[in-house]
Amino acid sequence: MDAMRITKTTFNDVFSNDANGSIIKVEKYVDKKCASVFEILTYTIIVTNTSRYKTGNIFFKDYISKYIEFINNTVKVNGIIKRGLDPQQGFYIGRIDASCKKIISFKSVVLPNSAHRIIKNSANIYYYYKCNLDKFPTRISIESNRVYTNVNKIVFKQLNISNTLKAPKNLR
């Protein structure tokens, strides 16, 4: 009697019995807690895969406040500049290996309409997660923590630049 034997098994979908799909952690940071009009803020978002499996098709989107404006061509993913990407439109950051992370950063300028205001900012990550092999993947949305920057009324900052020069002896 010829019996069929399984010689190779291939897994196409990553799934888990974690029903809420919380395998991604998102943390957001801003470089300045206090700023003035026309100052540049750098936002950094760390997306960590906390699972044992590689994740794919992760989409990043940032909801930029009306008090700041994104500076074109400042998006970096893991330190590499990604020209043409816009956090407000969103973009794919690709796969994240198990227990690894991707670091996204970008710059924005503080607008004049922001004096005496608090700039609030957060980001979102979207991905598909399958916890049951018999069902379609579920779209998961994870919002980062909010970061805050207080804006001063000061429009210009004073910079003091000093340099001591020694005059040649023949000029004294």
What kind of region is each of these model predictions?
Residues M1-R172:
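Exported/extracytosolic protein signature
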